[in-house]
Amino acid sequence: MRDIAVQATKEFSSLSVEPLLGDDSASSGFVCSLFDVLDFSIQDFVDREEEFAFTMAQYTELEGEKNTGQGLMCLATTDAHVEERWGEGYIKRKYGVHGLNSIWDEWGPDSGILPCPVYLRHCVLSAGRKGGEEGVAYRSFVEETFLADRKTTIEEHLARRPEIMLMEPPASVLGRYSG
């Protein structure tokens, strides 16, 4: 689990998108950072991010000519989907050594799962890369992204845990998780 998870406090979740249910779903959206996958192919990226489902999502740039396009988005999924993709018993083989029997199905709103602190810091820094803490991407991320409990925003979580933003990633992920 990349040597950054904190199992004792269930701080090992990553970040994904899931559908918004209800009346507002047709007009909903969020602001995110786009990045090019230059060092390897999209297939390499999909293989690395093994625990997700993926979709191509429409986007509109906020600045300049407001170009539109499509980008690959990581989606929440199910244990069955992961096992279908990687083979029966994959979760047990890969994550069982860490004491986990599930990647998705056991981690609902009442599970107590929290974001991996080093990864969360990386996401927050990335969101603020353009515009800082007052930038639209940063504000959208901290105000419109929720923990697994579906109630607590990233902003509220960081207010309770400000030390997260002071954590340095270990050498094994320093370049990748530095915002």
Where are the regions a protein language model picked out?
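Glycine-aromatic micro-motifs
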Residues: M1-G179
